[in-house]
Amino acid sequence: MKIYVDADACPVKDVIIFEATKAEIPVTLVTSFSHYSNAEQPKGVETIYVDSGADAADYRIMQLAQKEDLIVTQDYGLASLALAKGCIVLHHKGYKYTNENIEQLLQTRYLSAMVRKSGKRTKGPKPFTAEDKEKFRALFKSMIAL
């Protein structure tokens, strides 16, 4: 198993790095050049930089990921592609994407886009909380223990 993180705006990178390093599982953070950092990463953690274009990180993750790798993303499109490839896919708020829930998530995203396109406003996501982080940590630990 390898772990790939859609790292632009991912609020749980610290949890992923800490828990994966402890378990000696390699982590690849995929992020745009606009988030470039000279920060030293622990052994087993790699950062790949991609262009800032739409979906560039998603495409790179899909090139790299293999069946049974673990992907962390908030992007439903990437989650859908990764599930089809046989990957385990987690959202940073602590839930697992499945073949059963991805259809509804994609449909909701589409309907919200149609509402916005018609000039109306839609609600954004709720703020990320400490409870969300702990929920993610518990799920992540259970997934890497498999």
Curated annotation (Swiss-Prot):
Domain of life: Bacteria
Annotated transmembrane regions: none
Family indicated by similarity: Belongs to the UPF0178 family.
Protein name as it appears in the record: UPF0178 protein BCAH820_3075
